[in-house]
Amino acid sequence: MKINREFTIANQSPYESINFKKVSSEIVNPDGSLVFKLENFEVPEQWSQVASDILSQKYFRKAGVPSKLKRTDEKNIPSWLAPRIADDSDGEVSYSSETSSQQVFDRLAGAWTYWGWKGGYFSSEDDAKAFFDEVRYMLANQMVAPNSPQWFNTGLNWAYGIDGPSQGHFYVDHETGKLTRSSSSYERPQPHACFIQSIDDDLVNDGGIMDLWVREARLFKYGSGTGTNFSNLRGSSEGLSGGGKSSGLMSFLKIGDRAAGAIKSGGTTRRAAKMVVVDIDHPDIEEFIKWKVTEEQKVASIVTGSKICSKHLKSIMNACHNCEADGESCFEPAKNPALKREIIAARKNEVPENYIQRIIHFAKQGYKSIEFETYNTDWDSEAYVTVSGQNSNNSVRVTDDFLNAVIEDKDWNLINRIDNSVSKTVKAKDLWDQVGYSAWACADPGIQFHTTINDWHTCPESGEIRASNPCSEYMFLDNTACNLASLNLMTFMDENKCLNTDLFKHAVRIWTLILEISVMMAQFPSKEIAKLSYEYRTLGLGYANLGGYLMSKGVAYDSEEGRANCAAITALMTGISYATSAEVASEQGPFPGYQQNSKNMLRVMRNHRRAAYGKTDEYEGLHINPVPF
């Protein structure tokens, strides 16, 4: 592909026009203790302290960066693009953290250019150099940002020679098309943020319940998130082949929830990101809908109960010692009126009797104070750690059939997973009300509209869309992955407060190519995901700062004009991205899953075009037409 220069000049550093500054960053606990501190690292002058904090605290590689580097010699790779390794020729190399944003921009753009060159994506070496420079310029000027796993993982091997033993990943070799087990943890990075994984109703075999926790851990370790539709798991009322009843959906969801809570995505960066989806006809759907509501009620009980118990038990202790009676009489309610009064007050507030008696015996032994932990409602507190359901986004998958049953106040059958028999019949409206109440009470579960989602599915011949990633912007086949990038709309606004469409289209084209290259270079946590990601090559290009963009134009966010702006920008981005995809296909060939789905792919494209032009009819294969803008 030919790459034009819009922001940079050939044979000149893309940083030439950018001023840099030295800043510091730290994280301090409420008690004043220091969690993190990095001084005198380099960022572009226009960067805010928040942006600097995020880069240093989250995205800088914290260890293993050599103080001196040398280029390797790789066949058919230009010397300027060759991977680097530690230069220990004089025995004085040391290892530390990244300390400059330029290091990060260089390793990201360099790795993408390197793999793009290996994949034959550039028409010439000059095009590769233009790509390398344009990407670094856009990163430094906050015009575009990739998803977090790219910042965490991409380029560590290419830029610094960082490596480690394989973690059980797989990839498809772009030259041979052969599914291959990774021999390294970083030579091929894990750049994808969003995964959708399947689960079978099987306890210990590949693809089953326990195997999913291993696959999830492999993703969380490198900073990615995952979603799964758990509706294949049988309900608690269903039998087992060996006799007895199943533990049910919820018992296994609690295991996965606890496992996710124990893992920080990216090792030191954030907690695991996880989506749990359950179909609206699952036998255990009612318990699932109420899960977080019930758990948050437990938190309220823990917080309130701990404070009530602490207050009354300390009062009982004080009554035992602030006593004018003699000896043992102080510990007998009949002879110590103050103690009797405190015991009655504690019982009225449901303080457990065994705790009341325990404190009296404790005081009798000569102790004059107790420690009884109290808790608060901070989301990261011990109270929330104690309960389940706090480490995932939960969503209910609803069909048009269910929504019509709600509207018509009909019955709704909950279906057993093993034999498809009816487990229970409920009123659809009552179930819908439970969803609404739970979402109001604790913001979960969300709703995924199964019928509409699959009406816009570009590859339905390959299977239904059954779930999404944790944030729900990625919806596709099970066992696939998507890597994301977002364009900062404010940086594409011209002096007339309008979108500079030429620069925007240029950026969309380049970043579509980056995401395509990322599929080629990536490794994946399972054979199935590696295979299907290679065959379908999904990518997720979007934009950020829409609110700031509209505010700068003086357009209300929730207005017809605001929505029309959003629709137009989205249509332009989508169109250019698909056009770039077609350009890549003309040189590299279409993705392997295209031929089977070409009819539906083009149908969805025609529907996108109709929506872009505000059509109200002529749509193909839709149950509900989109709202025109």
Give the location of each predicted region.
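Extended catalytic cores of very large enzyme megasubunits
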Residues: 1-629
